[in-house]
Amino acid sequence: HIDVVAGAKLEELKAIMQRRLAEVAAGDRSEVPEYDIYPKELTAPYRDYRFQIGEDMYARLGIPRDDKAARMKWFARNYQSFGAPMALFCSIDRRMGPPQWSDMGMFLQSVMLLLREEGLDSCAQECWSLYPKTIGDFIGIPSERMLFTGMAIGHRNPEHPLNALRSQRAPVDTFTRFHGVS
């Protein structure tokens, strides 16, 4: 299930999220995610990949590792859709399991490719799932569904340093085994 938010409604959501983030900063922990974005015990090599992309991203932004306030301020831009004029939210029926979650990921990648074909850019933002009640109440997600993810949609700024960032790639042979392929 997809909800697309733009215009005055998106501005309203951005204002709601600014207030919500201020409440969280003041200690309000009443809203909890419905699923973990990462396993509680993320191990190597996945922990290392996650760490490295974070380091590369903040280095491009000129934000030092020890400047937690600047890092949090940057992260909060997620909830402004990075200035994009449109946000997409995806929710899924609670009865669905891992295969359907995979289907949603494949569907969203197809949406992102189709957006690109139409000259639009997108940024998948699973961080929205940290606020399922806030988002669910705003867009009217029924109780039988849960918020899966969000996505910013618009035109990227080619001058922004993050838009030139390319994550390091693991060598193919570290995650692929070939059988009967020469």
Predicted regions span which residues?
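Acidic, surface-exposed loops and disordered segments
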Residues: 1-182
